[in-house]
């Protein structure tokens, strides 16, 4: 009951703030106002989708009722989080900065409006940016998206900007990190594929009908951005107290069943590029990207491949050299960043999407050997690519393709029991029915 009263009191404050902004009382610096500033039924708090407006106007309602982001703070008090806090010697997870960094909108006090409340979880401004400078004015008929961006709204129509925003928590950055200690305490390992994760969200936005290529461009750009961010994470981790940081490595190279060594596919295939017993660097964020890059910029793809192989050799050594890893990771991150810019402006028509589907599916032997996380990345990407392709071009094999995609996901259901040859076989089956 008290929670509902607090929400209503904050809502009243939000209306006062918005009214002031409409009168031109803009703060000197942008501030975070909280999700209630969007919650009016005439703004984003409606129940029904409105078709005659540029937005659905039920965005807040969708988020607060259906979206897991709205409950990100609340999970910090559940039994799993409580146990994690005990293991990590944290008094309370819902008060710990390392937890609040991603389970709430964690911003400095100076950037919070009086209506701000961190218990709202991962809310509107976590993605769209501090609203104080455009909150009131963006409701006028003459206002445009571009003017909102100029006033401080994050441009989530930009593939790179959207990817960076999501990856801040779904991979980490200089201020947010999930390390091996946190994973051992019970936090899930982090993985991400933009198109799949977006599709899993309750949709609170209108489709971009003016750009039918946007879904594939977003997916492809995000692959490059997440590799860049992974490389920057490696460079940061070389400066840490613990080295190597095991969260940078392939978890399931160690965390798998060891009882049937006579049937071990790992021993059968061998340990290319490393010694047996040396955990390999996690290549899942490169495994799919390499085919995208080769299609957009073949020379850039070759350069990236050379640099990745060099870093893989350093990182997959039992005594990985910190300084060598730092230099190579930074160099390769710059290469990945340049390629991300190219990909973000490239054309992704049905013909290119079809080529990517075939190229990734035919790369099953390589992808499968990079471990379960790489296989999972391929399954998610292939499904997203096919759904985007099917929305623009009909396939006579639609039923068979969807069945083959389902098999890919079945092969990665149990990460510790992952079998590379079986996943490679499933990829070959998919390649045979793709258009």
Q: Could you describe each region identified by the protein language model?
A:
Residues 24-27, 34, 44-49, 102-103, ...:
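Low-complexity, Gly/Pro
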Residues 47-86, 113-122, 126, 130-375:
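Primarily the internal scaffold of c-type cytochrome electron-transfer domains
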């Amino acid at each position: 009951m008290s929670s509902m009263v607090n929400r209503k009191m904050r809502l009243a404050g939000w209306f006062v703030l918005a009214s002031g902004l409409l009168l031109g009382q803009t703060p000197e610096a942008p501030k975070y106002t909280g999700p209630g500033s969007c919650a009016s039924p005439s703004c984003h708090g409606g129940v029904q989708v409105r078709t005659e407006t540029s937005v659905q106007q039920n965005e807040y309602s969708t988020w607060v009722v259906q979206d897991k982001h709205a409950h990100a703070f609340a999970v910090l008090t559940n039994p799993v989080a409580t146990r994690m806090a005990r293991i990590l010697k944290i008094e309370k997870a819902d008060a710990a900065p390392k937890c609040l960094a991603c389970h709430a909108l964690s911003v400095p006090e100076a950037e919070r409006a009086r209506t701000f409340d961190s218990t709202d979880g991962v809310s509107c401004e976590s993605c769209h940016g501090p609203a104080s400078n455009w909150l009131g004015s963006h409701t006028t008929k003459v206002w445009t998206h571009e003017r909102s961006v100029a006033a401080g709204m994050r441009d989530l129509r930009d593939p790179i900007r959207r990817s960076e925003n999501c990856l801040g928590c779904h991979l980490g950055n200089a201020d947010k990190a999930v390390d091996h200690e946190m994973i051992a305490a019970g936090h899930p390992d982090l993985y991400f594929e933009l198109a799949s994760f977006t599709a899993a969200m309750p949709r609170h936005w209108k489709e971009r009908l003016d750009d039918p290529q946007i879904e594939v461009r977003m997916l492809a750009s995000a692959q490059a951005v997440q590799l860049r961010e992974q490389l920057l994470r490696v460079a940061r981790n070389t400066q840490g107290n613990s080295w190597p940081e095991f969260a940078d490595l392939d978890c399931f190279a160690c965390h798998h069943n060891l009882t049937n060594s006579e049937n071990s596919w790992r021993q059968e295939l061998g340990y290319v590029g490393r010694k047996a017993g040396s955990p390999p660097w996690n290549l899942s964020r490169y495994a799919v990207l390499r085919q995208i890059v080769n299609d957009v910029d073949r020379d850039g793809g070759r350069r990236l491949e050379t640099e990745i192989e060099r870093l893989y050799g350093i990182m997959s050594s039992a005594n990985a050299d910190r300084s060598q890893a730092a230099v190579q990771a930074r160099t390769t991150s710059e290469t990945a960043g340049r390629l991300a810019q190219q990909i973000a402006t490239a054309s992704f028509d049905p013909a290119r999407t079809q080529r990517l589907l075939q190229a990734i599916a035919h790369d099953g032997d390589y992808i499968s050997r990079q471990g379960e996380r790489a296989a999972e990345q391929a399954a998610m990407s292939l499904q997203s690519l096919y759904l985007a392709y099917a929305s623009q071009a009909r396939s006579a094999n639609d039923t068979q393709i969807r069945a083959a995609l389902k098999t890919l996901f079945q092969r990665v259901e149990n990460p510790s029991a992952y079998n590379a040859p079986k996943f490679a076989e499933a990829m070959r089956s998919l390649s045979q029915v793709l258009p």
